[in-house]
Every structure is written in C-alpha cells, then in structure tokens.
C-alpha cells in the first residue's frame, strides 16, 4: 500500500515532471504473472526510474545497510527504499547469496515482478560488465520469463558518489548545461525453459547469463567488458587501468 501510494502521488509525479524519462517496450511487461526483470546498473537512480516506468510493482533486492541506519534519518531512508519496492538483502556472499536467491524465488512464486542487476554493483565507467550466474539459476529454477532492461544515461544525471539526480548536466564541449532525459528500454522476454532441471550445470549457467547480458547490451548500446564490476572497482581504487587487465580478444591474438 505504501509503495503504491508514494509511487503514484510522490515519486512518479516528481520523476516524470523533472526528468521526463523516455520509456520504450512497455508492451513486453506482462499484465499479470511473474517475470524476472534484469537490468544494467549505471546509477543509484536506476532503482527509481525503472519502477516509475513500469505500471506494476517491481520488487528489488537492496543492501541491508539501507534499512538499518540509526535515528530518524535511518528510518526515513528505510521508508524511502521500501516505498520504491526494495527489500533488504545480505549481499556478503556464500549463504547470503543463497538467501537472496530464495527471496527472489519466493517473490516470483507469488506471481510478482522481481528485479535484479546481474552485474552485482554499479558500473564504474558506464560500460556493461560480466554478469553473475545467480540470475541464470533463478531464471531456470523459477521457470519464468526473463525480461532484459536497459537503463540509459542515468549515470549522467546521477554520477558515482551522488544520490540525488541532477536536473541539468554540464557536458564537455558545451557552454551551457542541458537537460538529460534518462531512458528505460524494455526488451522482449527471453525463454530458458529448455534448461529446466539444469540449474546446477555451471556451463549452462554461464551460457544463460551471457545470453541475458548480450540482450541487455543490444538494448543499451554499451560496450561489454569481460570482467566483474567489483574487480574493476578494485583496480580503479588501486590506481590501475581496467583495460590493462582484460584478456586479449581473439582478433588481437591473431594480429600479434
């Protein structure tokens, strides 16, 4: 009830009035029944603009820390995240990953929409990074349609380190800042029912994950990087160049 009220009367009107997000492919969202929405992750505001774009409620996993802050500020933050359909998830790995999987399956089992970012964290540089196979395991076990989604230009209005999106953006080569309209592109559902019962096969999981990431890349137009985003962030933090640590492509190997 809180989600529907705040989305309809507060979050959605403000987001649509100020940023006028461009939304395509809404016809690919089923009117009823479960589906897994998989999206690239460019900015904090992805979890605002995607729920605003889709008429049905989307449940997203979020860091449990967002729901456990102290004092009035902590309560307000927790209320905000719940208002945009997010639930607390321990993302520390191991058993926590299994708990996250089970939570997603429970949501889908209720016939709802569950959203997930296969990259596991926000892109450090606007490129699309290698997907984690948990998304494939969830898709195969749940047996639901997988709907690829591309968030576009959200990193421009909501750069790393910021929480509140900017209304106008100053870009290199332009004298005056301009209004950047974020985009939400929703692709056609992917069907992985042919892999039923194969959720323990790591080769199948990687193949399904890569197919999902390819669909997202086609929608977003992003460059794909064969490295986990978490690893890329570690390299940047250490002052290293991400591209120096990428495996050479087949064409590069032949050329040398």
Located regions from the model:
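Residue-level signature of transmembrane alpha-helical entry/exit and packing/kink sites
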Residues: 4-8
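Helix-to-loop junction immediately C-terminal to a conserved catalytic motif
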Residues: 9-41
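A generic structural signal for well-ordered alpha-helical segments
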Residues: 14, 80-81, 107, 139
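Short gly/ser/thr-rich secondary-structure transition/capping motifs
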Residues: 16-23, 96-98, 166-169
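Non-catalytic C-terminal accessory region of glycerolipid acyltransferases
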Residues: 2, 98-256
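A generic local structural motif
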Residues: 9, 21-26, 46-47, 74, ...
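Short, basic, glycine/proline-bearing loop/turn elements
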Residues: 10-12, 83-91, 118-122
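Catalytic core of membrane glycerolipid acyltransferases/transacylases, capturing the structured
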Residues: 29-94, 99
């Amino acid at each position: 009830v809180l989600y529907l009220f705040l989305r309809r009367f507060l979050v959605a009107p403000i987001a649509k009035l100020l940023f006028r997000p461009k939304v395509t492919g809404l016809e690919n969202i089923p009117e009823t029944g479960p589906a897994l929405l998989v999206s690239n992750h460019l900015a904090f505001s992805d979890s605002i603009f995607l729920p605003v774009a889709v008429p049905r409620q989307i449940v997203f996993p979020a860091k449990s820390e967002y729901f456990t802050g102290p004092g009035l500020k902590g309560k307000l933050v927790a209320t905000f995240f719940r208002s945009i359909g997010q639930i607390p998830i321990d993302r520390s790995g191991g058993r926590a990953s299994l708990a996250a999987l089970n939570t997603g399956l429970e949501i889908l089992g209720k016939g709802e929409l569950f959203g997930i970012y296969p990259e596991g964290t926000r892109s450090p540089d606007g490129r699309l990074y290698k997907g984690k196979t948990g998304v494939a395991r969830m898709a195969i076990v749940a047996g639901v349609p997988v709907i690829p989604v591309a968030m576009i230009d959200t990193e421009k209005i909501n750069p790393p380190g910021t929480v509140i999106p900017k209304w106008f953006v100053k870009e290199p080569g332009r004298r005056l800042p301009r209004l950047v309209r974020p985009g939400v592109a929703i692709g056609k559902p992917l069907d992985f029912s042919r892999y039923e019962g194969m959720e323990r096969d790591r080769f199948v999981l990687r193949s399904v994950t890569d197919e999902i990431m390819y669909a997202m890349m086609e929608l977003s137009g992003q460059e794909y990087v064969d490295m986990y985003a978490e690893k890329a962030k570690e390299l940047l933090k250490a002052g290293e160049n991400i591209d120096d640590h990428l495996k050479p492509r087949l064409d590069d190997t032949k050329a040398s």
